[in-house]
Regions:
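Glycine-rich phosphate-binding loop signature in dinucleotide/nucleotide-binding domains
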Residues: 70-72
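Conserved acidic residues
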Residues: 12, 33, 75
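Conserved class I S-adenosyl-L-methionine
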Residues: 11-20
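Conserved SAM-binding motif I beta-strand of class I
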Residues: 34-39
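A short helix->loop->beta-strand "cap" motif at the edges of active sites that frequently abuts
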Residues: 32-33, 106
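Conserved SAM-binding loop of SAM-dependent methyltransferases across substrates and taxa
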Residues: 21-32
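Conserved alpha-helix/loop element of class I SAM-dependent methyltransferases that forms part
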Residues: 1-12
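S-adenosyl-L-methionine-dependent methyltransferase catalytic module, highlighting the catalytic core
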Residues: 23, 40-47, 51, 60-67, ...
Protein backbone atom coordinates (compact mmCIF):
# COMPACT_ATOMS: atom_id res chain seq x y z
CA UNK A 1 0.00 0.00 0.00
CA UNK A 2 2.96 2.32 0.56
CA UNK A 3 4.07 1.77 -3.04
CA UNK A 4 0.55 2.42 -4.35
CA UNK A 5 0.20 5.58 -2.25
CA UNK A 6 3.45 6.96 -3.71
CA UNK A 7 2.66 6.00 -7.31
CA UNK A 8 -0.89 7.40 -7.22
CA UNK A 9 -0.08 10.52 -5.19
CA UNK A 10 -2.26 13.41 -6.39
CA UNK A 11 -4.74 11.35 -8.40
CA UNK A 12 -8.33 12.57 -8.09
CA UNK A 13 -10.53 9.48 -8.27
CA UNK A 14 -9.05 6.06 -7.45
CA UNK A 15 -10.63 2.59 -7.26
CA UNK A 16 -9.42 -0.24 -5.03
CA UNK A 17 -10.53 -3.55 -6.54
CA UNK A 18 -10.91 -6.09 -3.74
CA UNK A 19 -10.64 -3.75 -0.77
CA UNK A 20 -11.59 -6.31 1.88
CA UNK A 21 -12.10 -4.47 5.17
CA UNK A 22 -10.53 -1.30 3.72
CA UNK A 23 -7.67 -1.23 6.21
CA UNK A 24 -4.82 -0.96 3.68
CA UNK A 25 -6.58 1.73 1.70
CA UNK A 26 -6.12 4.24 4.51
CA UNK A 27 -2.52 4.79 3.33
CA UNK A 28 -3.65 5.41 -0.25
CA UNK A 29 -6.49 7.68 0.87
CA UNK A 30 -3.89 9.99 2.43
CA UNK A 31 -2.43 10.76 -1.01
CA UNK A 32 -5.46 10.83 -3.35
CA UNK A 33 -8.53 13.06 -3.46
CA UNK A 34 -11.12 10.28 -3.30
CA UNK A 35 -10.79 6.52 -2.93
CA UNK A 36 -13.60 4.08 -3.71
CA UNK A 37 -13.12 0.68 -2.11
CA UNK A 38 -14.93 -2.09 -3.92
CA UNK A 39 -15.39 -5.73 -2.92
CA UNK A 40 -17.85 -8.48 -3.85
CA UNK A 41 -18.40 -9.41 -0.19
CA UNK A 42 -21.08 -7.30 1.53
CA UNK A 43 -19.68 -8.16 4.98
CA UNK A 44 -16.29 -6.66 4.07
CA UNK A 45 -17.97 -3.50 2.78
CA UNK A 46 -20.13 -3.23 5.90
CA UNK A 47 -17.04 -3.52 8.11
CA UNK A 48 -15.08 -1.01 6.00
CA UNK A 49 -17.94 1.47 6.09
CA UNK A 50 -18.23 1.16 9.87
CA UNK A 51 -14.52 1.96 10.26
CA UNK A 52 -14.74 5.21 8.27
CA UNK A 53 -14.35 8.52 10.05
CA UNK A 54 -16.20 11.75 9.27
CA UNK A 55 -13.15 13.26 7.61
CA UNK A 56 -12.50 10.14 5.56
CA UNK A 57 -12.24 10.71 1.80
CA UNK A 58 -13.28 7.12 1.06
CA UNK A 59 -16.49 5.45 0.05
CA UNK A 60 -17.24 1.75 -0.31
CA UNK A 61 -19.41 -0.25 -2.69
CA UNK A 62 -20.40 -3.89 -3.12
CA UNK A 63 -19.60 -4.99 -6.65
CA UNK A 64 -18.18 -8.11 -8.31
CA UNK A 65 -15.66 -6.96 -10.94
CA UNK A 66 -16.09 -10.31 -12.72
CA UNK A 67 -19.70 -9.38 -13.50
CA UNK A 68 -19.30 -5.92 -15.06
CA UNK A 69 -17.22 -2.75 -15.03
CA UNK A 70 -18.35 0.06 -12.76
CA UNK A 71 -20.47 2.82 -14.29
CA UNK A 72 -18.17 5.55 -12.93
CA UNK A 73 -14.74 6.05 -14.47
CA UNK A 74 -11.55 6.37 -12.43
CA UNK A 75 -8.16 8.02 -13.02
CA UNK A 76 -6.49 4.97 -11.52
CA UNK A 77 -7.20 1.61 -9.94
CA UNK A 78 -5.22 -0.85 -7.91
CA UNK A 79 -5.76 -4.43 -6.88
CA UNK A 80 -3.48 -6.04 -4.31
CA UNK A 81 -3.64 -9.72 -3.45
CA UNK A 82 -6.63 -10.40 -5.70
CA UNK A 83 -5.47 -11.70 -9.11
CA UNK A 84 -3.94 -14.83 -7.61
CA UNK A 85 -7.46 -15.79 -6.45
CA UNK A 86 -8.99 -15.32 -9.94
CA UNK A 87 -8.99 -18.39 -12.18
CA UNK A 88 -7.04 -18.29 -15.44
CA UNK A 89 -10.39 -18.69 -17.21
CA UNK A 90 -11.67 -15.46 -15.63
CA UNK A 91 -8.49 -13.35 -15.55
CA UNK A 92 -9.23 -11.68 -18.91
CA UNK A 93 -12.71 -10.73 -17.73
CA UNK A 94 -11.16 -9.34 -14.52
CA UNK A 95 -8.82 -7.08 -16.51
CA UNK A 96 -11.39 -6.08 -19.13
CA UNK A 97 -13.84 -4.96 -16.45
CA UNK A 98 -11.15 -3.01 -14.60
CA UNK A 99 -10.20 -1.36 -17.92
CA UNK A 100 -13.88 -0.58 -18.49
CA UNK A 101 -13.86 1.24 -15.14
CA UNK A 102 -10.83 3.41 -16.02
CA UNK A 103 -10.56 6.69 -17.92
CA UNK A 104 -8.91 6.40 -21.33
CA UNK A 105 -5.55 7.36 -19.77
CA UNK A 106 -6.05 5.37 -16.57
CA UNK A 107 -3.31 3.79 -14.51
CA UNK A 108 -3.51 0.35 -12.89
CA UNK A 109 -1.34 -1.24 -10.23
CA UNK A 110 -1.60 -4.98 -9.62
CA UNK A 111 0.19 -6.70 -6.75
CA UNK A 112 0.43 -10.41 -6.11
CA UNK A 113 2.69 -13.06 -4.57
CA UNK A 114 5.18 -14.38 -7.10
CA UNK A 115 4.85 -17.89 -8.47
CA UNK A 116 8.27 -18.66 -7.03
CA UNK A 117 7.19 -17.62 -3.52
CA UNK A 118 4.65 -20.41 -3.41
CA UNK A 119 7.40 -22.90 -2.56
CA UNK A 120 7.47 -21.20 0.85
CA UNK A 121 3.75 -20.48 1.27
CA UNK A 122 1.56 -22.18 3.85
CA UNK A 123 -0.82 -24.92 2.77
CA UNK A 124 -3.77 -22.56 3.43
CA UNK A 125 -2.26 -19.89 1.16
CA UNK A 126 -1.53 -22.39 -1.58
CA UNK A 127 -5.15 -23.55 -1.60
CA UNK A 128 -6.41 -20.02 -2.33
CA UNK A 129 -3.58 -18.99 -4.66
CA UNK A 130 -4.82 -20.56 -7.87
CA UNK A 131 -3.22 -18.11 -10.33
CA UNK A 132 0.19 -16.89 -9.18
CA UNK A 133 2.52 -15.69 -11.92
CA UNK A 134 6.22 -15.17 -12.44
CA UNK A 135 7.40 -11.63 -13.13
CA UNK A 136 7.61 -12.33 -16.86
CA UNK A 137 4.14 -13.90 -16.91
CA UNK A 138 2.62 -10.93 -15.05
CA UNK A 139 4.23 -8.48 -17.47
CA UNK A 140 3.08 -10.45 -20.52
CA UNK A 141 -0.45 -10.67 -19.12
CA UNK A 142 -0.65 -6.93 -18.38
CA UNK A 143 0.83 -6.01 -21.80
CA UNK A 144 -2.36 -7.43 -23.34
CA UNK A 145 -4.19 -4.43 -21.84
CA UNK A 146 -1.59 -1.65 -21.42
CA UNK A 147 1.12 -0.22 -23.66
CA UNK A 148 3.47 0.37 -20.71
CA UNK A 149 4.02 -2.17 -17.93
CA UNK A 150 6.72 -1.78 -15.31
CA UNK A 151 7.39 -4.74 -13.02
CA UNK A 152 8.74 -4.18 -9.52
CA UNK A 153 9.86 -6.88 -7.12
CA UNK A 154 9.34 -6.82 -3.38
CA UNK A 155 10.98 -8.70 -0.54
CA UNK A 156 9.76 -7.81 2.94
CA UNK A 157 9.11 -4.05 2.53
CA UNK A 158 11.88 -3.39 0.01
CA UNK A 159 10.66 -2.60 -3.51
CA UNK A 160 13.22 -2.95 -6.29
CA UNK A 161 13.64 -3.67 -9.99
CA UNK A 162 15.84 -6.68 -9.38
CA UNK A 163 15.70 -10.30 -10.42
CA UNK A 164 12.00 -11.24 -10.24
CA UNK A 165 12.47 -14.99 -9.62
CA UNK A 166 13.91 -14.04 -6.21
CA UNK A 167 10.95 -11.78 -5.35
CA UNK A 168 8.30 -12.82 -2.87
CA UNK A 169 5.85 -10.25 -4.22
CA UNK A 170 5.34 -8.58 -7.60
CA UNK A 171 3.92 -5.19 -8.47
CA UNK A 172 2.89 -4.24 -12.01
CA UNK A 173 2.53 -0.52 -12.74
CA UNK A 174 0.47 -0.28 -15.93
CA UNK A 175 -0.07 2.91 -17.95
CA UNK A 176 -1.54 3.91 -21.30
CA UNK A 177 -4.38 1.38 -21.77
CA UNK A 178 -4.70 -0.24 -25.18
CA UNK A 179 -8.49 0.28 -25.22
CA UNK A 180 -10.33 2.98 -27.16
Amino acid sequence: YKFVSKMLDGYANVLEVGCGDGFGGTLVADTVEHLVGMDFDPLFIENATNLRTESDNRSFIVHDILEAPLKNRFDAAYSLDVLEHISKEEESLFMENILGSLDDNGTLIIGMPSLESQDYASIQSKIGHINCKSGDELKTFCKNYFHNVFIFSMNDEVVHTGFTPMAHYLLALCTNPTKG
